[in-house]
């Protein structure tokens, strides 16, 4: 098994029997103490964030992963039905695998699904940005458009995004799927 020092951000390891994604890994050497690695990880089964200190010589179980391109078709209860772009095989993906990205799933969007060595789904990676239409927001008056505030807006996927005052119903906006933040208005 590899040492924690060979693992990098984005790696997927088996920690306490469950798959975890390394969000950040920092090497620290405090005063008179031994060096250690401070790891911030995300449990891929529960979605919880975990912080742990690994000693420099500690070994970890790195999970061998396979990435495949899939296309989102429709929602079936709490699952998302995806189709393999090469074999056209359909699979059900649980909502927890998508995390916050579930709020921005549009029909026919292409995603990357990360599978573990045993074939189970570890995580789903959405495109960094998606273009969505604003379906509901408060109308802006002339005075509001001159100021630089934000207002809540509901987009076509049902997610709520804070947008600038000049955005109106029917506007198409670009949203960052990692943070859920407004990026820009799309001119069509």
Curated annotation (Swiss-Prot):
Signal peptide: none
GO function terms (MF aspect): translation elongation factor activity
Organism: Chlorobium chlorochromatii (strain CaD3)
Protein role: Involved in peptide bond synthesis. Stimulates efficient translation and peptide-bond synthesis on native or reconstituted 70S ribosomes in vitro. Probably functions indirectly by altering the affinity of the ribosome for aminoacyl-tRNA, thus increasing their reactivity as acceptors for peptidyl transferase.
Keywords linked to the UniProt accession: Cytoplasm, Elongation factor, Protein biosynthesis
One Pfam match: EFP
Family annotation (SUPFAM superfamilies): Nucleic acid-binding proteins (SSF50249), Translation proteins SH3-like domain (SSF50104)
A Gene Ontology BP annotation from the UniProt entry: peptide biosynthetic process
Protein's cellular compartments: Cytoplasm
GO CC, alphabetical: cytoplasm
CDD domains xref list: S1_EF-P_repeat_1 (cd04470), S1_EF-P_repeat_2 (cd05794)
InterPro entries in the cross-refs: Elong-fact-P_C, NA-bd_OB-fold, Rib_uL2_dom2, Transl_elong_fac_P/YeiP, Transl_elong_KOW-like, Transl_elong_P/YeiP_cen, Transl_elong_P/YeiP_CS, Transl_elongation_fac_P
Homology family: Belongs to the elongation factor P family.
Pathway per the UniProt entry: Protein biosynthesis; polypeptide chain elongation
Protein name: Elongation factor P
Top-level taxon of the source organism: Bacteria
């Amino acid at each position: 098994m590899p040492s924690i020092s060979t693992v990098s951000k984005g790696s997927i390891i088996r920690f306490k029997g469950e798959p975890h994604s390394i969000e950040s890994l920092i090497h620290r050497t405090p005063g008179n103490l031994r060096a250690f690695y401070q790891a911030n990880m995300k449990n891929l089964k529960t979605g919880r964030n975990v912080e742990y200190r690994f000693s420099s010589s500690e070994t970890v179980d790195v999970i061998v992963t396979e990435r495949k391109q899939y296309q989102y078709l429709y929602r079936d209860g709490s699952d998302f039905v995806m189709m393999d772009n090469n074999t056209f095989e359909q699979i059900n993906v649980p909502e927890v695998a998508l995390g916050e990205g579930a709020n921005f799933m549009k029909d026919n969007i292409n995603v990357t699904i990360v599978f573990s060595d045993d074939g189970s789904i570890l995580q789903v990676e959405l495109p960094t940005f998606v273009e969505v239409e604003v379906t509901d927001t408060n109308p802006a008056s002339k005075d509001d458009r001159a100021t630089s505030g934000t207002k809540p807006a509901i987009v076509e996927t049902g997610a709520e995004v804070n947008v600038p005052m000049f955005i109106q119903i029917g506007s198409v906006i670009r949203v960052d799927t990692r943070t859920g933040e407004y990026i820009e208005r799309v001119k069509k």
